[in-house]
Swiss-Prot record:
Pfam family, one: Intron_maturas2
InterPro entries xrefs: Domain_X, Maturase_MatK, Maturase_MatK_N
Role: Usually encoded in the trnK tRNA gene intron. Probably assists in splicing its own and other chloroplast group II introns.
Biological process per Gene Ontology, one example term: RNA splicing
Compartment(s) where it occurs, according to its Swiss-Prot or TrEMBL record: Plastid, Chloroplast
Keywords assigned by UniProt, alphabetized: Chloroplast, mRNA processing, Plastid, RNA-binding, tRNA processing
GO MF, any single term: RNA binding
Entry GO CC: chloroplast
Name by which UniProt lists this protein: Maturase K
Family that this chain belongs to: Belongs to the intron maturase 2 family. MatK subfamily.
Amino acid sequence: MDEFHRYGKEDSSWQQCFLYPLFFQEDLYAISHDHYLDGSSSSESMEHFSSNDQFSFLTVKRLIGQIRQQNHSIVLFLNCDSNPLVDRNKSSYSESVLEGLTLVLEVPFSIRSKYSVEGMNEWKSFRSIHSIFPFLEEKFPHSNYILDTRIPYSIHPEILVRTFRRWIRDAPSLHPLRSVLYKYRNSPENFKRSIIVAPRVNTRFLLFLWNHYVYECESILVPLLKQSFHPRSSSHGSFPERTHFDRKIKNIIRISRRNSLKSIWSLKDPRIHYVRYGERSIIAIKGTHLLVKKCRYHLLIFWQCYFHLWSEPYRVCSHQLSKNCSSFLGYFLRVRMKSLLVRTKMLDELFITDLITDEFYPIVPIVPIIGLLAREKFCDISGRPISKLYWTSLTDDDILDRFDRIWKNLFHYYSGSFGRDGLYRIKYILSLSCAKTLACKHKSTIRVVRKELGPELFKKSFSKEREFDFPAFSSKAAARSQRERIWHSDIPQINPLANSWQKIQDLKSENGKLNLFDQ
């Protein structure tokens, strides 16, 4: 792979004769088959795979022979199963071929994304949920509007092939891709005659299509936004929030003048803030109400011009930071003004300056989370805890571990937000629901369960020290968390309860059918 990267950096003409021969390498399909089994075993139970699903090099050779005969749809579908992208448990041969196709296309894509991102003025596309938390900590001294955008994920297969054709000169390597996409588009389960690419799918092939599609969108959209909202630089001799800027030293540039020994500090003063996770993105900009309407209109035109698809107007919503609140990844996002008093003394006079900046104020949606707990049978509609009858067949340790993981993951996800006192109401619901579940299992009361199992049992599972990941400084972290916002780094993805609530909010906005110029 290092040699591929070296060739790609020196000369991109190697792509003209490199990709297509990889389809005839038997080892590639063996590797892809191992990747397929590893991914399937992690996401699906092994009971779905029978002993007859064995990998045969003889079948692979036949598939390669049919690829040489240009019968791509026969290779990928007819000899394996009728619809491999929908029912992937019927046979693993089609998935192995798709994995091999994905491995071949990932080689130039990884090289292109690596070197093109380096040349985009240090712009990096956010790929992890951990990149959301610095965005929530950012200051917005100039932005007064946000655009909440949901990237459309229904796209025509030929548009995807054309996006690949822009940077892959090896045209024969795209024939299998075109066959796969059109076969999937013509499947009976697909009524829209388009490809659904989204980050929530599990197949590696569709995930690769999604990453490529989003990369193409951002590589075109981000430079346009940066040209429209050009950042300015302001020079300062000293900063009132020097501690805050030192923690974000990468945004400060030291400029030395040639004819002077003095040096000044130039702070990047951006007029645009952008963050994306999955199909949701937020753009914070500065402008008038008319300018925001135009920007919203151009975003909708962008999908039509570059990808020939119609994006519904409700997928791009605009909100004024000082008046409205929005939902993003399970948080209520509001903006509050933060004032800072600066005292400046000049000779015998003392000046007091009040600097006001805007910052995000993420709030925990307590009431919606309690409603989701009621839907999952942890409590009733009023928030009164009830027993989880489906878990009474489990052991006591499994029941305690499940309730503890729900609480710990929920607390860690909202650890850096405001209004965390309401989380302890959710803790009370979960702990009492756990006690009632154990009492229902042993056919006794909560008092008897506490007496038999001991009071230390619930303290071990729902202890306050387990809410923090600082073993040596747990007491200090607990005291500091009441004053500061601490984001935990063990959050792999959006919390399931928060994700369910976010989907409900998206459905409400979709059913509302917001007009293009309503906001």
